[in-house]
Amino acid sequence: MKEIKKINTLAEFEELKNSTLKNSELLLFKYRPACTISFVAEKLFDRWFGGLPEESNIVCAKIDVLALKPLSRHIADELSIQHESPQLIWLNKEGKVKWHGSHHQITERALGLSFAK
């Protein structure tokens, strides 16, 4: 089942990761609310995610990098990915990075190609 969650703490991130990755892939969408590029990337992502079949086994968490900068940096460090915003990080069921992109790399086409893998 696809769903979008907001996480606000490191504990919530760890809980989501531990409960989700057993059965689903996890998308982490990091954004900055006041940024135009983040706004556009979020709209593209929301449209793509909304178009997925309901039975898609994907969970998404959105992270406001202004409000949650330490969490955003923790995720980047844990996954060995440079912190950026907007940024989408796609984890497979094993918790490994399947795809990641930032700014103008976040497109419906790129997401569709990753979904097909």
Language-model segment annotations:
Residues 7, 30, 54-72:
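Thiol-based oxidoreductase modules, predominantly thioredoxin-like and allied folds used
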Residues 41-45, 71, 75, 84:
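Amphipathic alpha-helical interface surfaces
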Residues 24, 83-85:
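Short, small/polar residue-rich loop motifs at catalytic or cofactor-binding pockets
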Residues 49-54, 110-112:
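Short cysteine/histidine-rich metal-coordination sites, predominantly Zn2+-binding motifs
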Residues 84, 90-117:
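Non-catalytic, surface beta->alpha helical segment in thiol-disulfide oxidoreductase systems
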